[in-house]
Amino acid sequence: MPLQSKLALGLSCLIATAIAVLTLTPVPAPPLGSVAESDKIYHVVAFGVLAFPMAYLRPRWLMLAVPAYLAFGGLIEILQPFVGRDRSLGDWLADLIGLGIGVVIGLAAGRFVPFARPRMRR
């Protein structure tokens, strides 16, 4: 398997694991008066970071990766009530927005900053 493929898969698995741990860990209720929508930025950033490596290193795999990432975000929302957290369509939509941003940035980075490939020795 080429290095780019290993990096794309490895980083995606690592980031997805971090997202799962952070979103499925029970947390105390936010203090009264806090803005309930403030966590949306975390969803956007997390799923943008999740999409970036695949978009940058293996853009052809996005046709499979993006639906898998969306299903992953949906599964997290389904499971959250079992760990004392709230299920939210808004969170899943924030995941979708983050994926879009991560894909756009990853594709742009891949176009303008190509992955450094070691030269073959002759």
Stretch-by-stretch model annotation:
Residues 1-92, 96-122:
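Bulky hydrophobic segments
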